[in-house]
Amino acid sequence: NCTFRPPIYNRREGDAIKSVQIDHVLVGPEGVFLIETKNWSVDSLNNLDLRSPVAQIRRTSYALFKMLSGGVVNSDIALRSHHWGDRKIPVRNIIVFINQKPREEFQYVKVLTLKELRNYVAYFKPVFSKEETQMIGNYLLGLNA
């Protein structure tokens, strides 16, 4: 759980984010992967009373983006410079379904089964050095301390 005082405000969604619960964050040379896991049945997938995992991960992703941006601005995360400008930390949103997954695809969110996860992450080319990867990971671990 991450709590924010003052809340992080997402203007686009009109949402004051006071806290988020993050299932998993994978930090690797390929970027940062925000992973929400769901062990849902077919009935759960069709249940309109359950909160949308897509909305949930997009909300959490915005908070994670703001945390990482703060680390770069405050020089807690020092990425190798590039003569074109500031480099970004890609955050990729993944919902992993253990049992059933929906057939639909969603904007800014990849929906996978557990078996598909490894190949999806391996698909991306490295954008960070070993040192940068370690720095990002240490920064995120320090936020939770």
PLM feature spans:
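Phosphate-centric recognition/catalysis
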Residues: 23
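Surface-exposed interaction regions that form or flank ligand-binding interfaces
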Residues: 1-20, 41-47, 51, 55-145
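Active-site beta-strand-loop-beta-strand hairpin of nuclease catalytic cores
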Residues: 17, 26-42
